[in-house]
């Protein structure tokens, strides 16, 4: 086979339109046409078998034909009305996720008093949600890769809506424990909205738009606190659970408009559906479709865990798992630490305060006051500066450096908490730390869907989300249990963990800034041919992504 390929020695210069990932680098010439000297004797391309056993697609038999891939169409159509609608719709799912998470800090103390629950049962009510999320994240990613992004997202949202509403009618503790665990199981699939959303975005708008739906997370947390301020004193926690499901209900009503990812359709061989979706986007945006024939990527197994550990992605997967673990571990740890630090006034007062306080009955409780809700509100508002900072730097520094910057600044703020400082400085440090650790989360949500190919994108994001839930499960034992014995050791654990995450971000093999979304885990055969020609004839080659 190699002899056949390299016998192409005496053919004249041909001109063809470059397609696929190699044509979509930001540094490519605008024309997209290149002269390549091919020498040798023509052979029948349709019958050639590549080294990996993949037949050459017939679409490439005549290289002068106009062809395009989904990425080319998305770039040509651009950002418009369709993407704005999609932003709002996927943002609703993200907002609902934030509200279901924020309600944990409101529901737990209420049930602690109303049902006279011991402290360990209150803690279990929070932990069971994270257990559900951790156990389902990989499953939802697999479903989205196997059966479609739209299918996985719709099922997870409807699942969460159903059990979220049932939670409001739970008669006893055991019922609400099971139902909230099932809610957590459904929430584990909501991050797949990022996968679907990213696959419809042109390259230059992708980072900003993914950060845009992260704003919906911040809006959801603020809205949940405001809702609790007005609902809890008069109507109670059952009505709060019902009203908190409103964004999910709205999504369920509007999801009939949601299209399936054209990238997924192409990868699964549904060319007609992919073209129909692209034409629909072009019509809504008032933009023309690219001329030519849509190239169907070679079909391959989707949603296989082993694909995350191929030589090309093994190191990336392991580093991302640690980064996501550290992110959630530190984010939720800071949320828990904030209450303790505010109550004590500063770090130096915590140990003495805990020694002075007599042991209390585990059934003793206090309902949240309006002042408590306002403190929660001010804390959640720190999410917005994190979005703004990440939005400003992510396309300037790149994804890897942005994550590293956020983790390192959080680590420094944690170390500064060792100093005996006043409440005002304490508040400032906590807000800066919260802003940057949330910014690290946002940057990770941009990077992860970009680095994996379409065949494993949902699974990759799902497994990373699952590792984040492991961090969220562990962090109460550090922020609450370890804090009882040593506040300095607790702060050192969070600071050290994020410092290591910053180093891990720098060691990620691939920088995705200015890089097109990869359609397949294998190179397109056209790229393979150009690569071989480069080695033998010195023709320059454009990579679709940079590796450092």
UniProtKB/Swiss-Prot annotation:
The modification Phosphoserine is found at residues 25, 31, 542. GO terms for cellular component: synaptic vesicle; synaptic vesicle membrane. The keyword Nucleotide-binding does not apply. It is a multi-pass membrane protein. The chain crosses the membrane at residues 88-108, 123-143, 157-177, 181-201, 210-230, 239-259, 317-337, 374-394, 402-422, 425-445, 458-478, 490-510. Residues 109-122, 178-180, 231-238, 338-373, 423-424, 479-489 are vesicular. Residues 533-548 have a biased composition (Polar residues). PROSITE patterns: MFS (PS50850). Residues 521-548 are annotated as: Disordered. This is Synaptic vesicle 2-related protein. The gene is Svop.
